[in-house]
Amino acid sequence: MRVANIGDFNGDGVDDFAVGAANNGPNGTSDNGAAYVVFGASGGLPAGLTPGDLNGANGFTIPGASFGGSTGDLLGNAITGVGDMNGDGFDDLAVSAFYGDPNGVGGREGQAYILYGKAAPMSANVYPATLSANEVSIISGGNFDSEFVNDISSAGDVNGDGFDDLIVGAFRAADPNDYGSGSSYVVFGKASGFSATLDLS
C-alpha cells in the first residue's frame, strides 16, 4: 500500500490524499489494483471512512484493469502528488500501473496516468482510459513484459518554466530481460497538459 499527499486536487482550499493498493482486486482477483483519492474537509474526515464511501463529492476510486483470471495491471504500485503540471490552478496526481497494458493482452508493458485536478463533484469511479486529454495523460513507452513504470515522483519545477514536472522510473526500460537496464525520464509540465497519450520510448 502507498499513501501520498496530493495537494489540493479539487481546489477547495483543503489538501487531499491518495492511497494506492496494487494488490487489491474485486471478485476474487488479487492484482487488478486500485487507487483511492480522498478529499480533505475543513471539519475533518468521518471516522471509519472506507473506499465504498467515496462518492465523487468526497473522493473517488481509480479501479485497475483485469486481463482475465487473477491477472491484473497492479494499478497503484506507485502514487504521488505532482503539483500543478498544466498550470490550471489545481494540483495533479500521478499513479502507475506496473503491469499496465495498452493492448489489453497482459503484456506487462507498464503505464502511468497523470490525472489533472478539477473541482468536485466527479464520478465515484474514474477510469483513465475513458477520460479526455484535458483530464488525463496516459504515459507509456515500455516493451512487451518490460514493466515500464515501477516508480514515479514529483520533480518540482526542474526547468524553471513555472510548471511542475514528473520523474518516471523504469527499471527494465532498455531490455525487458535485464533487471539492470533501467532508465529515468523527466516529463516537463506545460500549459494545458499533454495529449491523451504520451509515449516515452
Where do the language-model regions lie?
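Conserved beta-strand/short-helix segments
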Residues: 1-201
